[in-house]
Amino acid sequence: MSSLSEYALRMSRLSARLFSEVARPTDSKSMKVVKLFSEQPLAKRKETYDWYPNHNTYFALMGILRSVGLYRDEHQDFKDEQLRLKKLRGKVKPRKGEGKRAAKKK
């Protein structure tokens, strides 16, 4: 006489699949693989994605502080100065519809 009926075996396999357990008995080597796949991926672990600060937030905050005058970003100051000098020399890109080809048509 068998210990479990066909129905009981099917139900136990189904419940194992539903609750992320191993459906059939497996050896220790296979269980090691199952354990590895059941762990959360490295990129989804909190200690991984909380390692670096949220750059978008910090960038926006530093921009606000810079505009108020509480933070000095020398690299951005340099880029702004270069753009200002470029405008003075007339070397800025023309706006749409004001380029060489548009000037020819007029």
UniProtKB/Swiss-Prot annotation:
A cellular component term, taken from the record's GO annotations: mitochondrion
Spans annotated as Disordered: 85-106
Biased composition (Basic and acidic residues): 95-106
Record localization: Mitochondrion
Basic residues biased stretches: 85-94
Residues bearing PTM N-acetylserine: S2
Disulfide partners: none
Source organism superkingdom: Eukaryota
UniProt cross-references to Pfam families, sorted A to Z: MRP-S33
Keywords: Acetylation, Mitochondrion, Ribonucleoprotein, Ribosomal protein
Keyword Transport in annotation: no
Oligomeric form and interacting partners: Component of the mitochondrial ribosome small subunit (28S) which comprises a 12S rRNA and about 30 distinct proteins.
Family: Belongs to the mitochondrion-specific ribosomal protein mS33 family.
Entry protein name: Small ribosomal subunit protein mS33
Provenance organism: Bos taurus
Taxonomic lineage from the root: Eukaryota, Metazoa, Chordata, Craniata, Vertebrata
Gene (name only): MRPS33
